[in-house]
């Protein structure tokens, strides 16, 4: 029994092993059949391939969207400011930076448009051609911004250049000016003279450039602009512009020491001459030169009430440091030694009377003091302003013209160098005025031409009623403007500054004009309530505009030899025999 069971176990195990062995080829055969069937049906593979390939662009597109979103969120680094290599390129960059059009700088340089004066002197058609060359013409708003920046540059180049220093930094200090020429004198003619000989402006620009290179980013420069000291070469000037970078301590110390030494030397040079009046024979008795610091502290701020196209804050430079080097002539009061407080506005006292009289404080003859001349200007002549003529303009006497000439001479000594302007009120200077700038007023015909083109009221190129005569004050202002233009001919092209100067000279001469004074009764205006004698309108704005010129040639500034002081006495004597233009 046991033998039979034992014999059966090997048989069963052998059969099991045999069956398992035989089952393995069947499984492999089954796998081969599946592969053969899948190869025989390519539609399944194609569908799988299509589905997998269709899912790939979706994932790639989503990843590209995520990448673009991350790039958009990433801050874009600002384009670096172009680096000018010459003075003209720096001036072009200053104008474009003011108009926020720096992207056109490279195009301007490539087209040869680095001369701002050439762009300003061209006519409208030429200007539009230039705008077309640089690609600005299709964008009218950019052209308008460019025009506004050029207009602001033409009004006051010194203030414009000061503002450009804090925006784009100083110009390159080397290889852009002729030999022996001071670069700061070209950019800031009124401020370059404030630096002493030991600290020339060329060295000042070099140190300024080295300090500017330490500023890493524009944002850091903007953050430090509020806390950085300001470039205030004149401590009394209200138009100081803070620079957009920090000064180093040695630079500040050297600048302060140079200012102190220059002011001390100017005081020492002036003090010996204050003991007597023999060194200034051209000045009237009682007028002595005073120190620069007293004048700077006593100059009143410009008035907010502007006249004759003079806007608020656009004074002609009485606060310029360049004018500080010129000796100021002040009137020493005979009995008073205390200095009064200056008036609150230019030409207006702090207490205004009911008649609105203009103040008597003068920045030329008596800052803070009483009038050098009493209110006797009208009594020097034969014309009575209370009984004016209805058909003839007033005529000034020889004594009145001589008084105006003396006040104009004292005023001209306190003015900074004023270069002529090619464009004023968006109009070019006429050829006749340019010819007057080239010659000296030594003949009666030249004096007559100066009176013609310096007139403020009743000009030949304005629309004025032919029957409307001038008042005595208007005639006096015209004569004061002519006397001042004889001494400073460039004021013929700077009429917005000539008008307030002429009015101040009239007040210095002793003519305190009351604004409420009525005009003479005009029969032609009796039926016109707008132009009645009691409500006479101010002069039209067109009366202060310069006559447009028909020529398009560029004006070349020629250096004229200065007229010696002793020659002006003979010219003033000739002026006494001349009558003002009727």
Swiss-Prot record:
InterPro entries, sorted: NAB_co-repressor_dom, NAB_fam, Nab_N, NCD2_sf
Compartmental location: Nucleus
NCD1, as annotated region: 83-161
Record carries keyword Repressor: yes
Pfam family of the protein (one): NCD2
Gene Ontology terms describing biological process: exit from mitosis; molting cycle process; negative regulation of DNA-templated transcription; regulation of development, heterochronic; regulation of DNA-templated transcription; regulation of vulval development
Region feature NCD2, mapped onto this chain: 396-519
Record's protein name: NAB transcription cofactor mab-10
Organism: Caenorhabditis elegans
Lineage summary: Eukaryota, Metazoa, Ecdysozoa, Nematoda, Chromadorea
Gene: mab-10
């Amino acid at each position: 029994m046991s033998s039979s069971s034992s014999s059966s176990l090997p048989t069963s195990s052998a059969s099991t092993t045999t069956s398992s062995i035989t089952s393995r080829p069947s499984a492999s055969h089954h796998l081969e059949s599946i592969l053969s069937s899948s190869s025989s049906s390519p539609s399944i593979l194609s569908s799988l391939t299509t589905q997998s390939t269709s899912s790939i662009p979706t994932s790639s597109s989503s990843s590209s969207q995520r990448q673009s979103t991350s790039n958009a969120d990433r801050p874009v680094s600002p384009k670096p400011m172009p680096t000018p290599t010459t003075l003209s390129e720096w001036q072009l960059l200053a104008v474009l930076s003011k108009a926020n059009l720096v992207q056109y700088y490279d195009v301007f340089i490539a087209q040869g448009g680095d001369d701002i004066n050439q762009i300003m002197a061209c006519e409208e058609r030429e200007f539009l051609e230039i705008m077309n060359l640089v690609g600005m013409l299709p964008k009218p708003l950019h052209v308008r911004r460019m025009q506004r920046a050029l207009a602001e540059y033409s009004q006051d180049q010194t203030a414009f250049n000061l503002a450009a220093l804090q925006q784009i930094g100083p110009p390159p200090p080397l290889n852009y000016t002729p030999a022996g020429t001071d670069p700061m004198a070209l950019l800031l003619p009124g401020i370059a003279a404030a630096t002493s000989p030991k600290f020339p402006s060329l060295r000042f620009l070099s140190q300024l450039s080295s300090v500017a290179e330490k500023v890493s980013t524009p944002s850091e420069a903007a953050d430090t602009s509020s806390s950085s000291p300001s470039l205030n070469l004149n401590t009394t000037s209200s138009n100081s512009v803070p620079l957009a970078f920090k000064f180093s301590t040695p630079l500040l110390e050297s600048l302060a020491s140079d200012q102190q030494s220059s002011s001390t030397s100017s005081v020492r040079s002036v003090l010996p001459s204050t003991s007597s009046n023999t060194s200034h024979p051209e000045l009237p008795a009682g007028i002595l030169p005073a120190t620069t610091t007293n004048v700077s502290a006593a100059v009143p701020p410009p008035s907010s009430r502007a006249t004759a196209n003079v806007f608020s804050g656009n004074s002609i430079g009485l606060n310029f440091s360049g004018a500080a080097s010129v000796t100021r002539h002040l009137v020493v009061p005979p009995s008073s030694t205390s200095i009064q407080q200056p008036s609150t506005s230019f030409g207006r006292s702090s207490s205004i009377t009911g008649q609105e009289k203009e103040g008597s404080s003068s920045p030329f003859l008596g800052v803070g003091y009483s009038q050098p001349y009493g209110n006797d200007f009208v009594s020097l002549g034969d014309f009575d302003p209370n009984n004016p003529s209805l058909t003839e303009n007033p005529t000034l006497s020889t004594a009145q013209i001589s008084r105006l000439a003396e006040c104009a001479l004292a005023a001209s000594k306190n003015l900074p160098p004023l270069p002529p302007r090619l464009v004023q009120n968006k109009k070019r200077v006429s050829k006749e005025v340019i010819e007057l700038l080239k010659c000296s007023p030594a003949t009666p015909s030249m004096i007559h031409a100066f009176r013609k083109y310096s007139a403020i009221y009743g000009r030949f190129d304005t629309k004025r009623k032919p029957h409307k005569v001038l008042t005595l004050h208007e005639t006096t202002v015209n004569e004061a403007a002519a006397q001042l233009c004889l001494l400073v001919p460039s004021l013929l092209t700077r009429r917005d500054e000539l008008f307030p100067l002429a009015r101040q000279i009239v007040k210095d001469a002793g003519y305190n004009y009351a604004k409420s004074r009525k005009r003479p009764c005009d029969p032609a205006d009796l039926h016109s309530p707008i132009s009645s004698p009691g409500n006479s309108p101010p002069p039209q704005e067109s009366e202060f505009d310069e006559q447009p010129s028909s020529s398009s040639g560029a004006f070349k500034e020629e250096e004229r030899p200065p007229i010696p002081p002793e020659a002006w006495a003979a010219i003033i004597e000739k002026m006494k025999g001349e009558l003002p233009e009727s």
